[in-house]
Amino acid sequence: MAHPSQLGLQDAASPVMEELLHFHDHALMIVFLISTLVLYIIVAMVSTKLTDKYTIDSQEIEIVWTVLPAVILI
C-alpha cells in the first residue's frame, strides 16, 4: 500500500510489475551514473588551469545546454 510520503513505487502485485520494478531500478542506476559522469566532466573542464582559450570558446553556453535539460527533467 502506498503512503503519502513514500519515495519509491508500490509493492508489486503481479510478476509483470515485479519485472517493471527491476527495470526501473536498473534504468535509474544507469541515469545516475551518466549524470555523475557528465557532472564530473563539467567540473573538471571548468576547474582546470590547462585549457586553451580557442578550444573552449563557448564553454558557458555548452554547460547551460547540458545542465538545463537535466534540471528540467528532474
UniProtKB/Swiss-Prot annotation:
Cofactor: Cu cation
Ranges per topology, Mitochondrial intermembrane: 1-14
Mitochondrial matrix side: 46-74
One of the protein's GO biological processes: ATP synthesis coupled electron transport
Keywords: Copper, Electron transport, Membrane, Mitochondrion, Mitochondrion inner membrane, Respiratory chain, Translocase, Transmembrane, Transmembrane helix, Transport
Cofactor: binding comment: Binds a dinuclear copper A center per subunit.
Catalysis performed (reactions): 4 Fe(II)-[cytochrome c] + O2 + 8 H(+)(in) = 4 Fe(III)-[cytochrome c] + 2 H2O + 4 H(+)(out)
Gene3D superfamilies referenced in this protein's UniProt entry, alphabetically: 1.10.287.90
Localization (cell): Mitochondrion inner membrane
EC number assigned by the record: 7.1.1.9
Keyword tRNA processing (UniProt): no
Family designation: Belongs to the cytochrome c oxidase subunit 2 family.
Function (record text): Component of the cytochrome c oxidase, the last enzyme in the mitochondrial electron transport chain which drives oxidative phosphorylation. The respiratory chain contains 3 multisubunit complexes succinate dehydrogenase (complex II, CII), ubiquinol-cytochrome c oxidoreductase (cytochrome b-c1 complex, complex III, CIII) and cytochrome c oxidase (complex IV, CIV), that cooperate to transfer electrons derived from NADH and succinate to molecular oxygen, creating an electrochemical gradient over the inner membrane that drives transmembrane transport and the ATP synthase.
Protein name: Cytochrome c oxidase subunit 2
Organism from which the protein derives: Megalops atlanticus
Upper classification of the organism: Eukaryota, Metazoa, Chordata, Craniata, Vertebrata
Name of the gene encoding the protein in the UniProt record: mt-co2
